[in-house]
């Protein structure tokens, strides 16, 4: 399995260095490798809207706070730790089930979160993630002890969703899903 943890933190630094008017298109470009995550949306999603809808950092208003958060994520070696967490999860899952079908390629987007969003920062502790579409994982993070202490576990958790609903796994039927599957999912 090829794991591609995107250089999204470096891209975020570049975004914060350009005029505000140029930022939306750069956010779209940063997120463009995730277009394949949504084949059911004709023409693909507007990646700026996806960024905003998944607690991504604001385009303007708190640049210095964003730079500080970005530096903390980089210092925490998030890219390397996400990849390590996925490798560790792969070893554990394939040891438990040698016939398990893994995605051929996994694209992971790590996005700096929005420190101005009260729900994101307080109720969900700076963590929003999604791994339910095979081949893609999205992690939106704000550096704090809850997030930084659990990077590998967060990545492994989302990878589990990826494998569970991938080829050979559970077929998700929202009209017939049982409560037990909802809980495990």
Feature map (PLM): residue ranges:
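Short pre-active-site segment immediately N-terminal to the catalytic Zn-binding motif
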Residues: 139-155
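Alpha-helical scaffolds flanking conserved acidic
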Residues: 104-106, 150-152, 179-183
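N-terminal low-structure segments adjacent to metalloprotease catalytic domains
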Residues: 1-67, 71-77
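Post-HEXXH active-site segment of zinc metalloproteases
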Residues: 165-184
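Auxiliary, metal-adjacent structural segments of Zn-dependent hydrolase domains
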Residues: 69-134
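Flexible, glycine- and charge-enriched loops at secondary-structure boundaries
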Residues: 75, 79, 149, 178
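Short acidic/polar capping segments at secondary-structure boundaries
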Residues: 112-116, 142-146, 161, 168-170
């Amino acid at each position: 399995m090829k794991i591609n943890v995107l250089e999204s933190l470096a891209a975020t630094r570049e975004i914060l260095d350009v005029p505000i008017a140029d930022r939306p298109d750069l956010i779209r470009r940063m997120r463009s490798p995730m277009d394949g995550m949504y084949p059911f949306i004709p023409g693909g999603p507007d990646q700026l809207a996806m960024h905003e809808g998944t607690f991504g950092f604001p385009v303007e208003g708190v640049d210095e706070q964003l730079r500080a958060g970005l530096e903390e994520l980089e210092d925490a070696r998030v890219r390397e730790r996400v990849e390590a967490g996925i490798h560790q999860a792969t070893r554990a899952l394939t040891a438990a089930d040698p016939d398990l079908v893994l995605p051929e390629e996994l694209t992971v987007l790590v996005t700096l979160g929005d420190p101005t969003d009260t729900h994101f920062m307080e109720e969900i502790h700076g963590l929003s993630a999604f791994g339910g579409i095979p081949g893609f994982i999205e992690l939106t993070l704000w550096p704090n002890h809850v997030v930084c202490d659990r990077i590998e576990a967060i990545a492994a958790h989302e990878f589990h969703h990826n494998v569970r609903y991938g080829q050979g796994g559970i077929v998700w039927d929202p009209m017939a899903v049982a409560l037990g599957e909802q809980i495990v999912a």
